[in-house]
UniProtKB/Swiss-Prot annotation:
PROSITE patterns from the UniProt entry: RRM
Biased composition (Pro residues): 261-325, 333-355, 362-388
Presence of keyword RNA-binding: yes
Subcellular location: Nucleus
InterPro entries: Nucleotide-bd_a/b_plait_sf, RBD_domain_sf, RRM_dom, SF3B4_RRM1, SF3B4_RRM2, SF3B4_spliceosome_assoc
Region described as Disordered: 244-388
Name of the coding gene: sap-49
PANTHER family, A to Z: SPLICING FACTOR 3B SUBUNIT 4
Chain ranges of the RRM domain: 13-91, 100-179
GO terms assigned for molecular function: RNA binding
Zinc is among the record's keywords: no
Biological source species: Caenorhabditis elegans
Listed name of the protein: Splicing factor 3B subunit 4
GO cellular component: precatalytic spliceosome; U2 snRNP
Length: 388
């Protein structure tokens, strides 16, 4: 199950497994890791004298996605009563250490790595799983641990907030850890802070953030109520550089922004009238406002289906256009000749126009050219005279 040299492995698909009990073998580790994905190789370095493994190993998967999935589901689970640490076995892992390492002392024996991680990850990104120092034989905690943060801002906040606080009914102590290759010098010096500020972690090396980051190109302390920032964010989101979003609430637009100038406010003595609303079907139109002094009120609108008449005859229908051949009822008949003239060619005069049949008990009106007929009987009302 062991593989060749590390350089032959796919480092992106290889994970590191630490905190292994002495009972764990390569076959057991294989059976555990195959639950996350297909395993290519398992390597557990062993001591040359005792031939026992040193408590850690490397597992190579078929792809990087399988390795990431194994880290998510298998990190901090207990194997033979000990929580194991699972993370990426990157060749440049040491370059991620900026020196923001803190020491946590006076821990209760019940405190494990997962509890420390859940407690201190609220202050910032933790690069590695918290390391609790344990007894080699029994595996019990020695009462102190080390936590490596990704920035000094996170470590300073954790030190200030957690020093002297109770964790599992014990007041813990939090301070910067001592350096390994120095004599009594702790982490968090000014030189380390300056070096960390000059060489920040690259985004590809930065672990997953617990909270969402600020959009790229926008400072974290920039208020979104600024006009330029609001337009820049909207243009970046929509992909249209010329897009101008509507102003935010409480903002005053500066300038015309390529539009028409705004309408000036009315003078104090004039009350602006609202624009008329078009009447909806089935509603009575709204009456016009009262006229000003010295002005006649406008005429009322005509009823539906009636056309407005000429001035002086409001509401009356217009007269029909004059017929080309005489009054109504004589359509198709030529006009009579003027008095003293005869029809050409000895033509007889046209017959009188025909009127529609009268109703029962009614007499038809006489022709216009004849005088009214005398009453035909007593008690009868004569017909009205013809129109002049």
């Amino acid at each position: 199950m062991s593989a060749g040299p590390i350089v032959e492995r796919n480092q992106d698909a290889t994970i590191y497994v630490g905190g292994l009990d002495e009972k764990v073998s390569e076959s057991i580790l294989w059976e555990l890791m195959v639950q996350a994905g297909p395993v290519v190789s398992v390597n557990m370095p062993k001591d040359r004298v005792t031939a026992n493994h040193q408590g850690f190993g490397f597992v190579e998967f078929m792809g990087e996605e399988d390795a990431d999935y194994a880290i998510k589901i298998l990190n901090m689970i207990k194997l033979y009563g000990k929580p194991i640490k699972v993370n990426k076995a990157s060749a440049h892992e040491k370059n991620m250490d900026v020196g923001a390492n803190i020491f946590v002392g006076n821990l209760d024996p019940e405190v494990d790595e997962k509890l420390l991680y859940d407690t201190f990850s609220a202050f910032g990104v933790i690069l590695q799983v918290p390391k609790i120092m344990r007894d080699v034989d029994s595996g019990t905690s020695k009462g102190f641990a080390f936590i490596n943060f990704a920035s000094f801002e996170a470590s300073d906040t954790a030190l200030e907030a957690m020093n002297g606080q109770f964790l599992c009914n014990r007041a813990i102590t939090v301070s910067y850890a001592f350096k390994r290759d120095s004599k009594g010098e702790r982490h968090g010096t000014a030189a380390e802070r300056m070096l960390a500020a000059q060489n920040p972690l690259f985004p590809k090396d930065r672990p997953h953030q617990v909270f969402s980051d600020v959009p790229l190109g926008v400072p974290a302390n920039t208020p979104l109520a600024m006009p330029g920032v609001h337009a820049a964010i909207a243009a970046h989101a929509t992909g249209r550089p010329g897009y101008q979003p509507p102003p935010l609430m409480g903002m005053a637009q500066s300038g015309y922004q390529g539009q028409y100038p705004p309408v000036p406010p009315p003078p104090p003595s004039v009350t602006p009238m609202p624009p008329p609303m078009p009447p909806t079907p089935g509603m009575t139109p709204r009456p016009p406002p009262p006229p000003s002094s010295g002005m006649w009120p406008p005429p009322p609108p005509p009823p539906p289906g009636r056309t407005p008449g000429p001035p002086g005859m409001p509401g009356m229908p217009p007269p029909p256009p004059p017929s080309r051949f005489g009054p109504p009822g004589m359509g198709g008949m030529p006009p009579p000749p003027p008095p003293g003239m005869r029809y050409p060619g000895g033509m007889p005069p046209p017959p009188p126009p025909r009127y529609p049949s009268a109703g029962p008990g009614m007499y038809p009106p006489p022709p216009p050219s004849r005088p009214p007929a005398p009453p035909s009987g007593h008690g009868m009302i004569p017909p009205p005279p013809p129109p002049s």
